[in-house]
Amino acid sequence: MSEETVPEAASPPPPQGQPYFDRFSEDDPEYMRLRNRAADLRQDFNLMEQKKRVTMILQSPSFREELEGLIQEQMKKGNNSSNIWALRQIADFMASTSHAVFPTSSMNVSMMTPINDLHTADSLNLAKGERLMRCKISSVYRLLDLYGWAQLSDTYVTLRVSKEQDHFLISPKGVSCSEVTASSLIKVNILGEVVEKGSSCFPVDTTGFCLHSAIYAARPDVRCIIHLHTPATAAVSAMKWGLLPVSHNALLVGDMAYYDFNGEMEQEADRINLQKCLGPTCKILVLRNHGVVALGDTVEEAFYKIFHLQAACEIQVSALSSAGGVENLILLEQEKHRPHEVGSVQWAGSTFGPMQKSRLGEHEFEALMRMLDNLGYRTGYTYRHPFVQEKTKHKSEVEIPATVTAFVFEEDGAPVPALRQHAQKQQKEKTRWLNTPNTYLRVNVADEVQRSMGSPRPKTTWMKADEVEKSSSGMPIRIENPNQFVPLYTDPQEVLEMRNKIREQNRQDVKSAGPQSQLLASVIAEKSRSPSTESQLMSKGDEDTKDDSEETVPNPFSQLTDQELEEYKKEVERKKLELDGEKETAPEEPGSPAKSAPASPVQSPAKEAETKSPLVSPSKSLEEGTKKTETSKAATTEPETTQPEGVVVNGREEEQTAEEILSKGLSQMTTSADTDVDTSKDKTESVTSGPMSPEGSPSKSPSKKKKKFRTPSFLKKSKKKEKVES
């Protein structure tokens, strides 16, 4: 059968474009043999191909992991059917026949029994943490076998499971180190009596456990004991000088104790002598002419001690055999050559990386566990330090928490084809928002439409953090130190005094404006504008016609030079003297228009313009304003000039009523900027016509009464007309 399969496997593939019946010639002997083959042979070949594919699947590590996950999931649900049991058998078979990850390793084995053979149902009756303890002890047995340190008898590794109940784990008698599994370990008490029998049928070696029980009774702090009697350790234990400090490994071992062991620990005197010899802190016990025992608080520490002790013994035996005696060896001094256990072993990352405390020998033991897992032993060890470092996320991802995490679901029903693209885009935005919520910030942006309408209300939007213009406050800073924002090179006592002072103010509930800013000390805030002068001049009867939107009258003297101010003072003094002379002549000739002309400066030039042309256009040019200033200056030089014809200030010819003058005055106040310049200059001239104080500043006339609201000039004018008529 095998001869027939060789040509079939070696035959070249037929061309793809040729028909099936044209591929073979009828005279071809291979074709004739295949055509005459029996149907059962063809079926056998097909089954062989199927089995080949099944074998490839079973040897796949991914399929094995998936199968183990399925078994664990079903066992958690409580499904203990025969199918699950069959799957478990398949998984165990695949684990025992799988190839090693590193086939070039010298310790490669073709067949191995998995260490962690505890299933979910078996782990229910175990104590807390006992499953991991069983896996560790079984792994140590496998390491002793791989390193060649295992002997046929009295090579035991024990572990204290519970301090309260004094239960211990030990391998059964007659089981080699390569056969020990987690389920085969036996749980015994301090007397060596079986508490829980393992999966094997072998008993406990009570004679070999006597030494371990005596050490556990003398040292309650010890959790693990490893007993070896390899040729190197037995040779060193037979030497009178014991272990010599000839290597670095001998220094790493630490303090040692020597005890004359006779092979039994049945007598009470032997236990007392062992306790005295061992002491409270010693971790290495050398049994004379027998071997060594390593003690440890953990399994990792015990294996760390026994590993370096075995290496030190091998170095010493080799050195003595080559040197010919102790006098030819160079011994290290313990005080000068101290090992760096704290920096290299006990503290992981003291030289590189963060300070993270670890147990003695933990990193070395985890490296060996990874080696066993790669070889397919399935140690079941729980790693504290992962082999591949995970990528650390940047702090910016958590500096700003997510403000909004909710989203709106789409409405039920068939999606509209026209909106399908929009829905997909919305879904992408929602997914991106949920995945990275910290890349968006809530920003108040002024809407252009609302700004054009005059509404200052901003518009709230969400923008990316990179697109937002950062303010002076910047990004939030994580406070890691309470004095992070204290200025450098400051006295700590001053900081404490200031802090106590602030706390005292908080206790007394003192309300203040807070510390004054040094940057804003020279800034002067703008005062709110006072109500317009025109609204103050309105009478109480005309309160309905007030206009609150009018602006304050500008200062009439702001645009004058020093020379003009001096001329203005002289003109005011001169007119004041003329007014005093006119008051005496006024009762004699009240109706004379020529004598009333000097009194015209009391009336504002703006009112003269209103009487002359009440319908003045609001858009006057600046040239007319300059002409008015020139005419006002000419009037100051020639005080006796008369007013134009047809204009009567206090006569009956004025037909305009007070209401009309008031409405026209208000309409002229709302004109453009050109009219404001003209009116400001006219008001400047009107102020010049008023009385002056001795210092030169305008002041009120002593004949006027102090009132809350000053009566407008055009109302006074109407009262004067009534007096003249009477």
Swiss-Prot record:
Region described as Disordered: 1-25, 525-726
SUPFAM superfamilies attached to this UniProt entry: AraD/HMP-PK domain-like (SSF53639)
Domain of life assignment: Eukaryota
Main location: cytoplasm
Pfam family, one: Aldolase_II
Biased composition range(s): Low complexity: 588-606, 632-645, 689-701
GO molecular function, one term: spectrin binding
Modified residues (Phosphothreonine): T55, T533, T611, T675
Keywords from the UniProt entry: Actin-binding, Calmodulin-binding, Cell membrane, Cytoplasm, Cytoskeleton, Membrane, Phosphoprotein
Post-translational modification: The N-terminus is blocked.
Protein biosynthesis in keyword set: no
Tissue expr: Expressed mainly in brain, spleen, kidney cortex and medulla, and heart.
GO biological process: actin cytoskeleton organization; actin filament bundle assembly; barbed-end actin filament capping; hemopoiesis; leukocyte migration; leukocyte tethering or rolling; positive regulation of protein binding; protein-containing complex assembly
Functional description taken from the UniProt entry: Membrane-cytoskeleton-associated protein that promotes the assembly of the spectrin-actin network. Binds to the erythrocyte membrane receptor SLC2A1/GLUT1 and may therefore provide a link between the spectrin cytoskeleton to the plasma membrane. Binds to calmodulin. Calmodulin binds preferentially to the beta subunit.
PANTHER family: ADDUCIN, BETA-ADDUCIN
Skewed-composition ranges (Basic and acidic residues): 566-586, 621-631
Stored InterPro entries: Aldolase-II_Adducin_sf, Aldolase_II/adducin_N, Aldolase_II/adducin_N_sf
Region (Interaction with calmodulin): 425-444, 704-721
Compositionally biased region (Basic residues): 702-726
Segments of skewed composition (Polar residues): 665-674
Protein name stated in the entry: Beta-adducin
